[in-house]
Curated annotation (Swiss-Prot):
Membrane topology: Peripheral membrane protein
Name of this protein: High frequency lysogenization protein HflD homolog
Protein's cellular compartments: Cytoplasm; Cell inner membrane
Record keyword Cell membrane present: yes
Protein's organism: Photorhabdus laumondii subsp. laumondii (strain DSM 15139 / CIP 105565 / TT01) (Photorhabdus luminescens subsp. laumondii)
Chain's gene name: hflD
Keywords in alphabetical order: Cell inner membrane, Cell membrane, Cytoplasm, Membrane
Length: 208
């Protein structure tokens, strides 16, 4: 069966968007609110109709991730590009550890289902929501190890709300990595199918 490179590219863009938003937060203490909303909602959408539905049914919701993906493929691995690549590969590695740990997978599903039922009690994109998602990341994902080392401004990274947002976005990145594997994504594509992925990303961006 032929791989659906459109869906693979969307899911990979989700992972890249997670990495890019973490970069922006850790260095600048700000990032695109709509893109963060897309990532948070991707966690809570546990029964999507399609891959695009995971991201709110609009390709433009992944614009930051698609551009980050092109940057990762097209630039030399130094500075910001190296950090982004490290985040992406770390998220993919955490997904593999998660899938090999049935207890952790079950716990993640249960915690997200519970939060999905409780989300009426949270203001969208509120501190409470970020703390709840961060709690899931700390309790379920972090113990899988190794932990993702986030680099940035020490002053910014000491802020508890920034810490919660970073962990929530990383949780979304793991969710996207699970999706990526489910639709046929794999690490070898990052080496051997990059031109096809680059072209697909450019095609999607052309009508975002």
């Amino acid at each position: 069966m032929a791989k659906n490179h459109y869906n693979i590219t969307l899911a990979l863009a989700g992972i890249c968007q997670s990495g890019r938003l973490v970069q922006q937060l850790s260095h600048e203490n700000q990032c695109d609110t709509d893109a963060v909303t897309t990532m948070v909602n991707s966690i809570l959408n546990t029964n999507p109709a399609s891959v695009l539905d995971v991201f709110g049914n609009h390709e433009r919701n992944l614009k930051i991730g698609l551009n980050a993906m092109l940057g990762m493929f097209n630039s030399s691995n130094n500075g910001i590009s190296a950090d982004l690549t490290r985040y992406i590969l770390s998220l993919i590695a955490l997904e593999r550890r998660l899938m090999k740990n049935q207890a952790a997978s079950d716990a993640l599903g249960n915690r997200i289902s519970l939060l999905e039922r409780q989300q009426a009690y949270f203001e969208p994109m509120s501190e409470g929501m970020f703390n709840a998602l961060a709690g899931i990341y700390v309790d379920v994902i972090s113990p899988l190890g190794p932990r993702i080392q986030v680099t940035g401004s020490p002053d910014i990274l000491r802020n508890p709300l920034v810490q919660a947002k970073v962990r929530a976005i990383l949780l979304a990145g793991v969710r996207c990595a699970v999706l990526w594997q489910q639709v046929g994504g794999g690490r070898l594509q990052l080496m051997f199918s990059r031109q096809r992925l680059i072209q697909q990303a450019k095609d999607i961006l052309s009508h975002c």
